[in-house]
Amino acid sequence: MSSLPVAAVLPELLTALDCAPQVLLSAPTGAGKSTWLPLQLLAHPGINGKIILLEPRRLAARNVAQRLAELLNEKPGDTVGYRMRAQNCVGPNTRLEVVTEGVLTRMIQRDPELSGVGLVILDEFHERSLQADLALALLLDVQQGLRDDLKLLIMSATLDNDRLQQMLPEAPVVISEGRSFPVERRYLPLPAHQRFDEAVAVATAEMLRQESGSLLLFLPGVGEIQRVQEQLASRIGSDVLLCPLYGALSLNDQRKAILPAPQGMRKVVLATNIAETSLTIEGIRLVVDCAQERVARFDPRTGLTRLITQRVSQASMTQRAGRAGRLEPGICLHLIAKEQAERAAAQSEPEILQSDLSGLLMELLQWGCSDPAQMSWLDQPPAVNLLAAKRLLKMLGALDGERLSAQGQKMAALGNDPRLAAMLVSAKSDDEAATAAKIAAILEEPPRMGNSDLGVVFSRNQPAWQQRSQQLLKRLNVCGGEADSSLIAPLLAGAFADRIARRRGQDGRYQLANGMGAMLDADDALSRHEWLIAPLLLQGSASPDARILLALPVYIDELVRRCPQLVQQSDTVEWDDAQGTLKAWRRLQIGQLTVKVQPLAKPSEDELHQAMLNGIRDKGLSVLNWTAEAEQLRLRLLCAGKWLPEYDWPAVDDESLLATLETWLLPHMAGVHSLRGLKSLDIYQALRGLLDWGMQQRLDSELPAHYTVPTGSRIAIRYHEDNPPALAVRMQEMFGEATNPTIAQGRVPLVLELLSPAQRPLQITRDLGAFWKGAYREVQKEMKGRYPKHVWPDDPANTAPTRRTKKYS
């Protein structure tokens, strides 16, 4: 084993660990960094305490632990053990624990000092999983505040050294070049006329015919693996084994894919991107890369995760090709045009930028951090995703202001997805706890295909679900209890209230309580049910509606009876313009879904008035009797707020008036029981009621409704929201006025629209004095000819004004 490439850098690595709290190790897959190096570190006297090795994938974690134990001629659970969701294999003598990401986070939360741990290794860090980024942030916080003696080793096949070194400038970087042989990289775009699975199978079978050795085939997901395997079966010889490789397989099937083919046989390993770097698959000389991967992208607008199939990055293509050169010169066939491959993104996007962050936010709040920016991140969590996470935690009752509520603390202590944690802590009896635990186990590991009825799935007893249920019940300190299908609906409703769904039409389409659409196959037996709770949804790329993967049919009346907190009651009004009456209704709703509508028989005046106010808010202020006088009063108040801000003017914009209807309109509604009566309300007086006597006097003085011109005429001022106030007056009535009139304590000049004797505009000005001295001469000249019997003096500023339209003889 000492011939492994990473052995060459072991002395340098041990020295670095002795001298620095954080060390970066870059070593390609197959160098021995996961399956040999941890045992050497275990023997190093400079590391005091246990070693925790984080593997981001469960499949890799179990296989790494198995391999390390075999090297010691032991079984997992002795010196080397592992911990993952629903599976623990550690003993009293375990000194090296291989754990998955969520497990490491739980260990840190329960014991922030990581007592008894000397070294934490983050393996495959280049994958930049959400939990790995969180683990790094927490570990750096632990080192800084609690354990300056804790060592941290960050290992990767393609380490992003520049960014990590910026974040950890004092950390030594150890590089193992690895051992690889030349790989010939070929490119072949798939024919457009052929189905994907068939085209991939044809290309793979052709490579097997032309070349010797076992082959690793990269595919986007399990569905493609199964379909391509079926296509390949009829295209290969009896000396070729087909070995799928993905997380849901049994340990024996996974080992069959990882170990060398039997003597005289070849194998084709059909794998997802887990085989890029997480596992060393022995005996591979050929690689076929479909150049695609399936990734999850969270949509903060809908709260749903969308699975998309996309082209892999150039870094992933390089990693995939490298798997062909571990033992001897190899060949990699990329099923993509070379120019397309060269245009691919350089690196894959980190999960933290495209994931649901509700679990991360709950972990940070449990850690005592209400501002994620206070932690150390390679990429800051997106603000919009954090906002969506906060909304969900609030809906689940996990927040008290900016901190975790008592319920939120119980949820965080469980370490589950926030929705499942909320469901688990809501259990009030042992039977409810047992039911919630089984539901959580099913939703964590849902069946890949088959029945979409959660009630039917719940009736099954799969060993993995039973094992996980028992683990969750232990965390809840519950012994006993029987899982009861009659308890599923109320438990689900508390955690998935926004995913209660009502059928719309007969084609399997539903509307969710959050307003989103969802769908079942039209022939799915569930589609005959009016109401569902759909805890498992997947947002596809082809349809705006989410696909319902698992749902429970419910009787809505029974659900409302058992969970009254789900329902919001609202009294609304319908306007019957033809009859001039109001019809009041009471609606029971769950989110945006209407459960029941019933008329309000003989509502009291208070109920009717409230319904009318709700109706005004629904339809807008335009339903009220806005006379010209009322509209001008409102505009005067709006302008007063801008021009005289030192006084406490009431807010009269639409939003404010609608929000305060009870304050200014309701007191004037006594005896109003109909739409006709509502339209007869004096809105002018209602608005003036917003002002006390002193403010009314100030408004009338500083922003008057009328202006008295030199002739004594009281002429209405026209106020505008976005334009200066205007006064339309015949020019002769302004003679003798030397300066432009102003309002608002002289701060705002009136716009004068000076009219001809025929009431046609002659001039618009905000500086009357300048007009008399300047442009008036041109007006005078023209008007004398057009209106010779009217007064057009040479000195209008000092001429007596007149209402008369003719000269005296």
Over which residues does each language-model region extend?
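Short, isolated positions in well-ordered beta-strands
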Residues: 181, 518, 714-716
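Acidic, serine/threonine- and proline-rich low-complexity intrinsically disordered segments
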Residues: 399, 432-517, 530-706, 745-809
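Charge-dense polyanion-binding interfaces
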Residues: 121-122, 250, 254, 426-447, ...
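Short capping micro-motif at the N-terminus of alpha-helices
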Residues: 520-521, 585, 717-718
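Extended active-site and interfacial segments that coordinate phosphate-rich ligands
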Residues: 111-126, 136, 290-294, 303, ...
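P-loop NTPase motor module signature
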Residues: 1-423, 483, 538, 722-724
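C-terminal accessory/binding modules appended to enzymatic or scaffolding proteins
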Residues: 686-748
